[in-house]
Amino acid sequence: MAERKATNKYYPPDWDPSKGSINQYRGQHHLRDRARKIDQGILIIRFEMPFSVWCLGCECHIGMGVRFNAEKKTVDKYFTSNIYSFKMKCHQCSNQFEIQNDPKNTDYKLISGLKKRIEQFNPEDSELPSSFIIKYDDNNNNNNNNNNNDNNDTLLKLENKKLDIEKGKKESTQLEKLQEIMTNRTINDYQLSSIMRKSFREKKKEDQIELERQKSKGIMIPLLKENQDDIDTAKDIDFNSNSLKRKLDESNKLKRELIKNESILKSTNNVNNNNNVNNNNNNNNNNKIEAIIRKKSKIDPSLFNNNVNKNKSKVNETFTSNLFK
C-alpha cells in the first residue's frame, strides 16, 4: 500500500525532482521490509523446500513444497552462475538451517541443520520390463568391478529376455484391442456423427414437449420421467379408504335400526282426515328420531341428508345413548 501511494499517487508538497526519487527522498528501499538487510547483501525471499527433509533440531519432517521466509545471499560463483545461500528457521523449533544451490549438478546442497529424507524405490514393484531394471552394488567401486557389473547386466538381460517377450506379447494384444476399438469408432465417423446429432435433436424436441406440458399444468420445476415402478406405487395408495368404509357401515346400521323400529301394524283408516293426521304424526316422529340420533349416536350426520328422508318409517321408541356400542 505504501509503495503504491509513493510511486503512483502521493507526492509530499516539499518534494521536487531535484531531490531524486521519492524512495531516495524518504530514505526507503523500493522492496520495503524485505530489504532491511540489503546493506549486508541479504534479501528476504519466500523459499520453497525442493525435497523432503528432516529437521535436526526437533526431528520434524518437512515435506517438499513447504515455504519459508529465507535470507538469500550470494556466497560464491560457478563460472558465471551465482551460488546462493538460503538461511531460514524451522516452524516447529528454533533450529536454523542453511541450503545452497548447486549449479554444477543442478541440485541443492544441505549445508547445516537438515538431513535429506531417503525415499526407497523398488523397481520390481513397477511394471517396467526387467531389461530396464539396473541393480547397483555399493561395495564395488573400482573399474574392474564396474566391468563385471556390466557383464552381469548383460547376462541378466539374456536371462530375462523370455519374460520380456511374453510380457510384450500381452501388452501387444492389449494395444491391438485398443487399436481395433478406435478403428471401429472412426471407420464410419460421418454416419455415427449424423446418428448422434439426430438423437440429440429428438431428445431436445421431447424435452420441449414435456416442458410445455408441465407449464400447462402449472408446474414450474423440472420433473423426472414416469416409470412403471412409480405407476405401480401410485396404484397401491388408497386414500381415505377407512373413512369411506366407516361411513358405509354407519349408513347400513342406520337403515337396520330404522327398519327394526317400524310399526308392524299399519293404519287402515279410509278417511282422508285420518290419513292426513297419521302422515303428520309420522313426520313428527321421524324428525324426533333424527334429532335424537344426531344428538346421542355416533353416526356421521351427513348420512341423514340422503337416508332418513328417503326411508320414512314409524318409530315407536327412542334410541338410548349406547345404541351403537
From Swiss-Prot:
Sections of the chain in a coiled coil: 156-262
How is this protein annotated for GO cellular component?
post-mRNA release spliceosomal complex; U2-type spliceosomal complex
Q: Which GO terms describe its biological process?
A: mRNA splicing, via spliceosome; RNA splicing
Give the record's keywords alphabetically: Coiled coil
Does this entry carry the keyword Coiled coil? yes
Q: Does the keyword Nuclease apply?
A: no
- Annotated family: Belongs to the CWC16 family.
Q: What is this protein called?
A: Coiled-coil domain-containing protein 130 homolog
The organism is Dictyostelium discoideum
